[in-house]
């Protein structure tokens, strides 16, 4: 039984109530009683609107399902389909042209293009690593990944391999030549660095060279005659060359260079949503406490490596001597967003006894806005009471709002933020919104969605996986879908990615707000990432998601190769897609799959689902590196789970597979997943007692009940089954 404290119409779990009163409120100048009165009023006033928005989702889906079931024209008539969606209010008229007016936004969002990390807020170590990933070692990123081949004696091994190290140095030198070139010379031939008359001078064997563009020299540390580091800038990002001839690496380098540091994760999203398993008050309080530590600057974590333990803390800012003297200070940490949950889920960390509520759990998205907003106040001030580190330098709080369906839901988010600002005593417009373009109704009405948040929006971002999950679920009754691996090559995907950029640019995003693109999920395949992910900045995206600090450093190289703002200038004014392209449903043209192909698809998806769900349910891990059926490590979160479960639910609905096929595949794949997790002492095997494994049953539910889940979301089943396991463990 949860211990609760009454606050007006609300009954708040004591663990959350005490955290807010004793840890979050002190230093904010907000009175405890007035805060909880404000929470009560916001929850009571806005809950009916939230419920109405969810009813609209269900009503529209029911009408679309009915239309597909009863349509007589085959194949689908695009004009009739478009007219139907317009008639029911799913497809809305586009507003007149406009320009966003958001103000008080940090440079990391407006004028700097670079990588964006997303990390689970429940893991303090991950959160610290991500916040500190603003700067990363290129040498380490190259040496430790497959970007540098292990052929010709360049194996990683246990100790330092000079053959591999030399390849790393050569790669980094080429990067410098490409990004911050010397006039008539190469960094490969450098023998030293110094500063003369505010200019960088690079010594060569018999002469010296300057930068081809002297304006790329940004500063240094040490003395002008004997600098310890050289700071360079390109496309708004910084590169720092570290010099130490006495170090292990510097001693082998002709110029004494020991490392090249890249400005990497410019922004980071601290995630309360798809990458976490937060199902009750204890989980929410842990997430809020970590968010508080990040904003106060006092979050820390003891880390043990090679039998040595140290305490990881947040980095301070970095100070350099400017080229002509004086001090230059650069941020030492990534600018932090926080991703709240969407409009769907409730959480009984707070229950409401307001009229008609009868003890119902409160909408979690409303809770998140109130509590993450409150906590973020600490990140706006540098005082003894708030901590000495700040997040925003312009007085803004950045909240990513996921899984919104259409402009009415965006408008509701803006109303929620406005009400929260009133409770917190913040100026209107302090709480900025990042709009995830990951639901079909938002994609089709993106211009109207942006218009609804024109004075708050700071980013739009595509999310291929969730968007595909919604694509499948919306058209669940239309027929069987193509295989998961083929989705990336469909007409609607290209139209979706292009339309997001075009719409953002038309609304004045360039130089004012981020246009983002999705995650690289193959965490170990960094050579492939370096080769392929450059397509995102080339497409006009000012940021794109990466799965680790190492990946952020490697992806940062792409923004040195591509001037994203120049690309945006070329794309400005273009409309490269049509509504009909966006409405192209990825249906299989004919069911020509061989039985072994169907079995392969089912096994692949069942293995992926089990591999993620077993850690979610049994260990409360919401974001995992899950080996696929071929043992390739993939970054999995609820978005990947949504597409896998929805595809199988679709095939089940249309008779491509049976429930017996699903069960047989799950039973085949569970022992494989058990084997892949054999090295984890906390792991509980699913085989052979499948029906005793709550995780196994959750995976089965997600497929067999997938067609009935709201918009294909996985949270309702996951939360119910995780709470069931917690109850069993506590019994």
From Swiss-Prot:
Metal-binding keyword on record: yes
GO biological process: glyoxylate catabolic process; glyoxylate cycle; tricarboxylic acid cycle
Domain of life: Bacteria
Binding site for glyoxylate: 339, 438, 463-466
This protein's UniProt keywords: Cytoplasm, Glyoxylate bypass, Magnesium, Metal-binding, Oxidation, Transferase, Tricarboxylic acid cycle
Pathway where it operates: Carbohydrate metabolism; glyoxylate cycle; (S)-malate from isocitrate: step 2/2
Alphabetized NCBIfam families for the sequence: malate_syn_G, PRK02999.1
Similarity-based family: Belongs to the malate synthase family. GlcB subfamily.
Name assigned to this protein: Malate synthase G
Organism, as annotated: Mycobacterium ulcerans (strain Agy99)
GN (gene name): glcB
């Amino acid at each position: 039984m949860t211990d609760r404290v009454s606050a007006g119409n609300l009954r708040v779990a004591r663990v959350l109530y005490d955290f807010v009163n004793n840890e979050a409120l002190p230093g904010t100048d907000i009175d405890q009683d007035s805060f909880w009165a404000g929470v009560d009023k916001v929850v009571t006033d806005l809950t009916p609107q939230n419920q109405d928005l969810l009813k609209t989702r269900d009503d529209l889906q029911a009408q679309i399902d009915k239309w597909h079931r009863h349509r007589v024209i085959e194949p689908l008539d695009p004009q009739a389909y478009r007219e139907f969606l317009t008639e029911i209010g799913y497809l809305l008229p586009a507003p007149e042209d406009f320009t966003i007016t958001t103000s008080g936004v940090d440079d990391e969002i407006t004028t700097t293009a670079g990588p964006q990390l997303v990390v689970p807020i429940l893991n303090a170590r991950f959160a610290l690593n991500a916040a500190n990933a603003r700067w990363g070692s290129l040498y380490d990123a190259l040496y430790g990944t497959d970007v540098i081949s292990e052929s010709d004696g360049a194996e990683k091994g246990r100790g330092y391999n000079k053959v591999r190290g030399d390849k790393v140095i050569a790669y980094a030198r080429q990067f410098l030549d490409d990004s911050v070139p010397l006039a008539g010379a190469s960094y490969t031939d450098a023998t030293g660095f110094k500063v003369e008359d505010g200019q960088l001078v690079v010594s060569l064997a018999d002469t010296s060279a300057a930068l081809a563009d002297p304006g790329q020299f940004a500063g240094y540390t040490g003395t002008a005659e004997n600098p310890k580091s050289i700071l360079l800038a390109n496309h708004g990002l910084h590169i720092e060359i570290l010099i130490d001839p006495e170090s292990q690496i510097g001693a082998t380098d002709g110029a004494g260079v020991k490392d090249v540091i890249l400005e990497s994760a410019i922004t980071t999203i601290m995630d309360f949503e798809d990458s976490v398993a937060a199902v009750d008050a204890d989980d929410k309080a842990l997430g809020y406490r970590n968010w508080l530590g990040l904003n106060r600057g006092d979050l820390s974590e003891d880390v043990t490596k090679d039998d040595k333990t140290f305490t990881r803390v947040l980095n301070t800012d970095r100070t350099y001597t400017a080229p002509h003297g004086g001090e230059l200070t650069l941020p030492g940490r990534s600018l932090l967003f926080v991703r709240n949950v969407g409009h769907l889920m409730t959480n009984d960390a707070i229950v409401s006894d307001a009229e008609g509520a009868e003890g119902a759990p409160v909408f979690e998205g409303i809770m998140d806005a109130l509590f993450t907003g409150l906590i973020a106040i600490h990140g706006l001030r540098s005082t003894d009471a708030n901590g000495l580190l700040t997040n925003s330098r312009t007085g803004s709080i950045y909240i990513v709002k996921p899984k919104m369906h259409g402009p009415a839901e965006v408008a509701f988010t803006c109303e929620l933020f406005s009400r929260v600002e009133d409770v917190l005593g913040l100026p209107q417009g302090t709480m900025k919104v990042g709009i995830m373009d990951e639901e079909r109704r938002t994609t089709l009405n993106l211009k109207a969605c942006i218009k609804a948040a024109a004075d708050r929006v700071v980013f739009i971002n595509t999310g291929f996986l969730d968007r595909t999950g919604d694509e499948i679920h919306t058209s669940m009754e239309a027929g069987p879908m193509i295989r998961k691996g083929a989705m990336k090559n469909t007409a609607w995907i290209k139209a979706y990615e292009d339309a997001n950029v075009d719409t953002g640019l038309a609304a004045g995003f360039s130089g004012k707000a981020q246009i983002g693109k999705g995650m690289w999920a193959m965490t170990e395949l960094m050579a492939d990432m370096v080769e392929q992910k450059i397509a995102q900045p080339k497409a006009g995206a000012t940021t794109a998601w990466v799965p680790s600090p190492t990946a952020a450093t490697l992806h940062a190289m792409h923004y040195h190769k591509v001037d994203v703002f120049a690309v945006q200038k070329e794309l400005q004014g273009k409309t490269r897609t049509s509504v009909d392209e966006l409405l192209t449903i990825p249906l299989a043209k004919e069911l020509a799959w061989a039985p072994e192909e169907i079995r392969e698809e089912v096994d692949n998806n069942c293995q992926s689902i089990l591999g993620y769900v077993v850690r979610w349910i049994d260990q409360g891990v919401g974001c995992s590196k899950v080996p696929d059926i071929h043992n390739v490590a993939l970054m999995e979160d609820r978005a990947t789970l949504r597409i896998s479960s929805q595809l199988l639910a679709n095939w089940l609905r249309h008779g491509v597979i049976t429930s017996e096929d699903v069960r047989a595949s799950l039973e085949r794949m569970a022992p494989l997943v058990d084997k892949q997790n054999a090295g984890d002492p906390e792991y509980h095997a699913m085989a052979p007692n499948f029906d005793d494994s709550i995780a196994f049953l959750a995976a089965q539910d997600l497929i067999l009940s997938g067609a009935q889940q709201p918009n294909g979301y996985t949270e309702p089943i996951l939360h119910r089954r995780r709470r069931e396991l917690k109850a069993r463990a506590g019994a």
